[in-house]
Amino acid sequence: MARYIGPKCKLSRREGTDLFLKSGVRALESKCNIEAAPGIHGQRRGRQSDYGTQLREKQKVRRIYGVLERQFRGYYQAAASKKGATGENLLQLLECRLDNVVYRMGFGSTRSESRQLVSHKAISVNGKTVNIPSYQVRPGDVVAVREKSSNQLRIVQALELCAQRGRVEWVDVDSAKKSGVFKNVPARGDLSADINENLIVELYSK
């Protein structure tokens, strides 16, 4: 499956919630009617079956983290093989992706932009360049913007935006040095309550 490159607003409207695919400079509601599904019949949201509800939740999470279907299934299988709650394991694996950590640290204004920074070799982990967005960051890893990329305007603007909205507690960032430490894997209670990972587990358990 190819990566979606169309309007980000359309994806948020499809899921009926803000997927944080935009930078957040303006409120999403000012430019995107997320209460209505995309298309000419968007005002009509029909009743969903249990399967439909489970599928929509899976699509929502997959789109939030920018993961393709095959990758997402792989994450689920890895989560199911680990000890603990499969749904929580799944979210933690997604949170440990390098592109997501770059976003959480504020070096990219969106996960999509953060993924591009990683792919373009603008990011290092423990002093070594890593250009794999799916790279799993571990507690204690130092993630930084490489010196040759540190003056990019989009990175400077992303850090300013992050300072306004605040950072998550599981990263410690020195904005001046454009470097941060991934302190720990977030617990389920630290992550979005708007995600019902149990629906995803039910979907893949069929």
From Swiss-Prot:
Residues 96-156 form the S4 RNA-binding domain. Keywords: Ribonucleoprotein, Ribosomal protein, RNA-binding, rRNA-binding. PROSITE patterns: RIBOSOMAL_S4, S4. Pfam families: Ribosomal_S4 (PF00163), S4 (PF01479). InterPro entries: Ribosomal_uS4, Ribosomal_uS4_bac-type, Ribosomal_uS4_CS, Ribosomal_uS4_N, S4_RNA-bd, S4_RNA-bd_sf. It comes from the Bacteria. The keyword Ribosomal protein applies. Coiled coil: none annotated. GO terms for cellular component: small ribosomal subunit. Disulfide bonds: none annotated. Gene3D superfamilies: Ribosomal Protein S4 Delta 41, Chain A, domain 1 (1.10.1050.10), RNA-binding S4 domain (3.10.290.10). SUPFAM superfamilies: Alpha-L RNA-binding motif (SSF55174). One of its GO terms (molecular function) is rRNA binding. GO terms for biological process: ribosomal small subunit biogenesis; translation. The keyword rRNA-binding applies. HAMAP family: Ribosomal_uS4_B. One of the primary rRNA binding proteins, it binds directly to 16S rRNA where it nucleates assembly of the body of the 30S subunit. With S5 and S12 plays an important role in translational accuracy. Belongs to the universal ribosomal protein uS4 family. Part of the 30S ribosomal subunit. Contacts protein S5. The interaction surface between S4 and S5 is involved in control of translational fidelity. This is Small ribosomal subunit protein uS4. It comes from Pseudomonas putida (strain W619). The lineage of its organism: Bacteria, Pseudomonadati, Pseudomonadota, Gammaproteobacteria, Pseudomonadales.
